[in-house]
Amino acid sequence: MPVAVVTDSTAYLPAELSGTYDLTVVPLTVVINGTNGLEGLEIQPAEVALALRARRAAVSTSRPAPSQFTEAYQRLLDAGFDGIVSVHLSAKLSGTFEAATMAAAELGDRVRVVDSGTTAMGLGFAALAAATTAGRGEDLESVRAEAADHASRVSTLFYVDTLEFLRRGGRIGAAQALLGTALSVKPILHVVDGAIVVRDKVRTAGRALAKLVDLAVEASGDGEVDIAVHHMEAPDRATALADAVSMRLGDRLRDCYITEIGAVVAAHVGPGASGVVVHRRP
């Protein structure tokens, strides 16, 4: 049998694609006031938003246990797959990659783990490319290489109303968080070398979103691209972002997706967050 592809729940694949590709998804966990819930299965973004607005609620996230990956990998191997490529969110943002690597070590060279260096559809585009390659019957190394190549072809940009939630979760330093809150500055962030850093600062939310469009177009280069627009409880803003980027890119835009971020990333970016992932096609 061909190669199986595994990813994690932070890929946030659009609903129209989730049933089209053969992917196994291992969920991360969200913890609200001490109660654990699996992302996408037991807890949804709206519950996280409600807890974050409550202020007194304690919200955190945790990686899957290595045993969750071991079980998923073994199930696929028992089903007859020759090998597995497991593609995950940045190792600098989560212990998920580490947990997957620990599980893979128990199974020899039949499992290859890829650090996408990003999250959301930045991860999703890499996982989809791997699944497409696996579907053609390519070998284990070819599928791994395709995942890594497409992960290198994405730019992940996003706007948050406040850096406070990222600071609380340890995903951004206190100094950068202070910069983002000074004088009511609205921060635009991006993922660089697997870490979240402030890319730009503007005075209003409107200017931040306009800048996000400019940066997405800049990141697209000169060739054909796909984009994914993410949001947390901001569908109208996401639609406006998608329309603005689409208009600027014209015929170079191949596919455009709009999808709400899941509970794990929602716990760190907070209500109102919006993002654009640019995938530069080979």
Protein language model annotation of sequence segments:
Residues 51-77:
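Glycine-rich oxoanion-binding loops at beta->alpha junctions
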Residues 60, 86, 113, 228-229:
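Short catalytic-loop micro-motif centered on adjacent basic/acidic residues
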Residues 63-64, 115-117:
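Short beta->alpha junction loops
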Residues 68-100, 104:
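N-terminal glycine-rich phosphate/adenylate-binding segment common to multiple enzyme folds
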